[in-house]
UniProtKB/Swiss-Prot annotation:
It comes from Arabidopsis thaliana. Glycans are attached at N133, N233, N237, N256, N300. Its main location: secreted. Its EC number is 3.1.1.-. Pfam families: Lipase_GDSL. GO terms for cellular component: extracellular region. Residues 1-24 form the signal peptide. This is GDSL esterase/lipase At3g09930. One of its GO terms (molecular function) is hydrolase activity, acting on ester bonds. It comes from the Eukaryota. Keywords: Glycoprotein, Hydrolase, Lipid degradation, Lipid metabolism, Secreted, Signal. GO terms for biological process: lipid catabolic process.
């Protein structure tokens, strides 16, 4: 997720009263087959992108991104693996090949699925970003299916789709200086479009679609930098919760309309908070000294992770051990951060599976 720095003034309203009972609106289906999918299709933004953006257009292809895995930049917005990789690992499959690299991958590699996510994008067009939004990403998926030379209709029922929406639409809302009084209505538009996208993916043949809730935006280092990375912004998190409440409602409606297909909200929000608050031996979850402080930052507010000056000299600082940091840069978790989040989510994944 590439939120602009003006995200610091994110949201002014608290909608806490709307959040009660959100989980109860999520229907449970008792007739689900307990079989894990064998291929993964991915749509969304930089929390899921594994290398779709051209190298000339993205910091994710610059040093020090990829320093942990694969020890060089790979187009991932992290020092290593991201959400897509850990979900694929849970499924027991290789991480799906990025769409833009499909012509360079062998047929066997493509059978694990395909990743259509592009960093910095949203469900709608995002500001100053020519990359494909989610509707266009699904268009690409539909074209691949129509070609018929990689996937057959019989492949799709045993597939899973991951739909990542981490906040770029709201960053664009703020960048365009729209009145904050319009924000709740815009949130509903975003969530309604997520539901439209998820249903479209289902109608193309995918029977299981996972949509992560939005991570606590008020805990991003781009926000917490203003209190020396000491605490999350409660107002921003309350507004994030409105998005998540609306998402649960929308997904509940889809589940009521499309049995036995299941749309699942994967609880990134509370998984992030669980990791932040971990003070003891939570199985598989790292204990971070200060989880809000990122590993890689610019030397000052004019620079970001990976920036160099006109002489090629580094204008960023990296922490001594990326594994000791939950966040890699001011927006994105580190590999160890993502690993801890998906360790928390392991029980949830096991409970909803398939």
């Amino acid at each position: 997720m590439e939120l602009p720095k003006l995200l610091i003034s994110l949201f002014l309203f608290s909608f806490s009263s709307f959040f009660l009972g959100a989980e109860s609106d999520y229907p449970q289906h008792s007739n689900l087959k307990r079989l894990r999918p064998n291929r993964l299709f991915v749509f969304g933004d930089s929390y899921a992108d594994t290398g779709n953006i051209r190298k000339s257009l993205s910091d994710s292809w610059k040093i020090p991104y990829g320093i942990t895995f694969p020890q060089k930049p790979s187009g991932r917005f992290s020092d290593g693996r991201v959400a897509t990789d850990f979900l694929a690992r849970y499924l027991g499959i290789k991480s799906p090949i990025p769409y833009t690299w499909k012509d360079y991958a062998g047929k066997e590699r493509l059978l694990y699925g395909m990743n259509y996510a592009y960093g910095g994008t949203g469900v709608f067009k995002t500001k100053d970003n020519p990359l494909p939004n989610m509707t266009t990403q699904i268009d690409y998926f539909q074209r691949v299916l129509a070609a018929g030379n990689i996937y057959s209709p019989s492949d799709l029922p045993s597939s899973l789709a991951l739909v990542s929406v981490a906040g770029n639409d709201y960053a664009t809302f703020l960048a365009l200086k729209r009145p904050l009084t319009e924000l709740p209505a815009f949130m509903k538009q975003v969530v309604d479009q997520i539901a439209v996208n998820a249903m479209r993916i289902h109608k193309l043949g995918v029977n299981k679609i996972v949509i992560p809730s939005m991570q606590p935006l008020g805990c991003l280092p781009s926000i917490t930098v203003f209190n020396s990375f000491q605490r999350c912004n409660a107002t921003d998190n309350a507004s994030t919760n409105l998005h998540n409440y609306l998402l649960h409602k929308a997904i509940a409606r889809l589940n009521n309309e499309t049995k036995p297909s299941t749309f699942v909200v994967l609880d990134h929000y509370n998984a992030f908070l669980t990791v932040f608050k971990n003070k003891g031996p939570e199985p598989g979850v790292s204990r971070f000294g200060n989880p809000l402080k990122p590993c890689c930052v610019g030397v000052n507010s004019s620079y970001d992770c990976s920036n160099v000056d006109e002489k090629g000299e580094k204008k960023y600082i990296i922490c001594e051990d990326p594994k000791a940091a939950f966040f890699w840069d001011i927006f994105h978790p580190s590999e160890e951060g993502w690993r801890s989040v998906y360790s928390v989510l392991h029980k949830h994944l096991k409970a909803i599976w398939i």
